[in-house]
């Protein structure tokens, strides 16, 4: 399966709790931190919820 590199580009300060939890569930902690995860429907759904806060690249 393909891998995705997700980078937190905007801060979660002032965002709703659900968006903060989603960012945390993706494994992102600080602004500009990145994680590489497997591409699957669950991860894609999480990315869609916080798409305005993250950037995604295919690896």
UniProtKB/Swiss-Prot annotation:
Does Lipid metabolism show up as a keyword for this record? no
Q: Which SUPFAM superfamilies match?
A: Ribosomal protein L30p/L7e (SSF55129)
User: Which GO BP terms apply?
Assistant: translation
Q: Which GO terms describe its cellular component?
A: cytosolic large ribosomal subunit
MF (Gene Ontology): structural constituent of ribosome
| Ranges in coiled-coil conformation | none
Q: Which CDD domains match?
A: Ribosomal_L30 (cd01658)
NCBIfam families cross-referenced by the UniProt entry: rpmD_bact (TIGR01308)
Q: Which family does it belong to?
A: Belongs to the universal ribosomal protein uL30 family.
For this entry, the protein name equals Large ribosomal subunit protein uL30
What species was this sequence derived from? Answer: Staphylococcus saprophyticus subsp. saprophyticus (strain ATCC 15305 / DSM 20229 / NCIMB 8711 / NCTC 7292 / S-41)
């Amino acid at each position: 399966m393909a891998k995705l590199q997700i980078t937190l580009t905007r801060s979660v300060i002032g965002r709703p709790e659900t968006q903060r939890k989603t960012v945390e569930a993706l494994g992102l902690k600080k602004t500009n931190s990145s994680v590489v995860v497997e591409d699957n429907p669950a991860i894609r759904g999480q990315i869609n919820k916080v798409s305005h806060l993250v950037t995604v690249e295919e690896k």
